[in-house]
């Protein structure tokens, strides 16, 4: 039966992950030449977020033996 609790709670599961993700965010923004902030376009911010996701997936695949699921 379905659980009524939302699975999208943004709760950190790994201690220190927030700092690592923030560091990754600023490194990628620097690589892309994006200045993060309120004046940055959604497209620019989205490109940084998309790249974070891409790199996290690559890291997970490497740790799982490089297999695709």
From Swiss-Prot:
Entry's Gene Ontology molecular function annotations: double-stranded DNA binding
GO terms, biological process: DNA topological change; sporulation resulting in formation of a cellular spore
Key words, A-Z: DNA-binding, Sporulation
Keyword ATP-binding belongs to the record: no
Gene3D superfamilies: Small, acid-soluble spore protein, alpha/beta type-like
Annotated site (Cleavage): 27-28
Keyword DNA-binding in record: yes
Pfam families: SASP
InterPro entries (UniProt xref): SASP_alpha/beta-type, SASP_alpha/beta-type_CS, SASP_DNA-binding, SASP_sf_alpha/beta
Function: SASP are bound to spore DNA. They are double-stranded DNA-binding proteins that cause DNA to change to an a-like conformation. They protect the DNA backbone from chemical and enzymatic cleavage and are thus involved in dormant spore's high resistance to UV light.
Other noteworthy facts: SASP are degraded in the first minutes of spore germination and provide amino acids for both new protein synthesis and metabolism.
PANTHER family associated with the record: SMALL, ACID-SOLUBLE SPORE PROTEIN A
Family stated for the protein in its record: Belongs to the alpha/beta-type SASP family.
Protein's recorded name: Small, acid-soluble spore protein C4
Organism: Priestia megaterium (Bacillus megaterium)
Gene, per the UniProt record: SASP-C4
